[in-house]
Amino acid sequence: MSKKVLITGVAGLLGSRLADWIIQNKPEYKVVGIDDLSGGFEENINPKVDFWQMDLVNHPIENCFEVNKFDYVFHFAAYAAEGLSPFIRGYNYDNNLKATARIVNECIKTNVKRLVFTSTLAVYGHGDGGVFNEAQVPKPIDPYGVAKYACEMDIQIANEQHGLDYCIVRPHNVYGIKQNIWDKYRNVLGIWMYQHLNEESITIFGDGEQTRAFSYIDDSLEPLWNAATKPDASKEIINLGGIEKHSIIEAALILKEVTGACCVAYEEGRHEVKHSIPTFQKSIDILGFEHKTNLKEGLTEMWKWAQKQPMRERFVWPEYELEKGIYSFWKN
């Protein structure tokens, strides 16, 4: 019987690129992917993936589990828009918490060896002076972080009650080829590339002194695989990457150097964490993470790819659940 892995969110950045990596480096595994194509694109999916177009909340995902009997499950599917989440609360909790609960149920029923769940550094909130350590008690400041933290707790309870093995990974500002650059609510580097491709000024919210740590997608792929397969990763929570720190202004200057973008427009500040710097030693020690690609190198590769992409319409949220307090730059 062939070995099988499931990747949810297989049309997105993490999912599509991990599928490529497994197919190339672990040919003994069959890759099955689920995605509803709400935030990713079918052309991102490797043709060797057995693709199921499904909504994790409303469609019968149990059929996929029953047919395949997965060894490992990588649950990446999520709409990761921290700033937008206060205005789409219902969708945020359905898309993250309810979907994850269904995945957890099926992993338990079918005896999956390990569930790898991608959480977020948004669970930390402001952290300890802007530094995020896995030992800290999470204090999220937005509904997206709340939802992801609830998912983490549910997965840990599933381990305690049902023996479901897991590794919770908290990636940080992962970027690269196959990222959705057409979504105006998330992924600052992709937003800037879209703006430059469409001859718009690149936008910075607030003073631009916010600090972020960026990770190129290629550096994260083998560590994600190790999260599923390494014995030491069992029942661990691990920040992934985030070794290279930049202010938003510094990141914009690097992007301008790579792309030739010239104009910067400053917008009103948002409700967000000022400094977001993870500790990363556990990802090195347990997952074998290596920081191989600096921001300029990664943006150069991403920019080569972005210039070849179709001129899709920009994604605009059709109707907010809550209009009160929404930022002027997001008003429809």
Located regions from the model:
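Generic structural signal for alpha-helix termini and adjacent loop/cap motifs
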Residues: 17, 25, 79, 88, ...
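The catalytic Tyr-centered alpha-helix of NAD(P)H-dependent dehydrogenases
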Residues: 140-147, 171, 181, 185, ...
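C-terminal substrate-binding subdomain of Rossmann-fold SDR/epimerase-dehydratase oxidoreductases
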Residues: 55, 197-332
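Conserved sequence/active-site signature of Rossmann-fold short-chain dehydrogenase/reductase
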Residues: 123-124, 174-176, 220
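N-terminal Rossmann-like NAD(P)+-binding domain of SDR-like oxidoreductases, especially those catalyzing
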Residues: 1-171, 320, 326, 330
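Short beta-loop-alpha junction of Rossmann-like oxidoreductase domains
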Residues: 126-128, 177-180
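Hydrophobic alpha-helix immediately C-terminal to the catalytic Tyr-X-X-X-Lys motif of short-chain
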Residues: 150, 154, 158, 188, ...
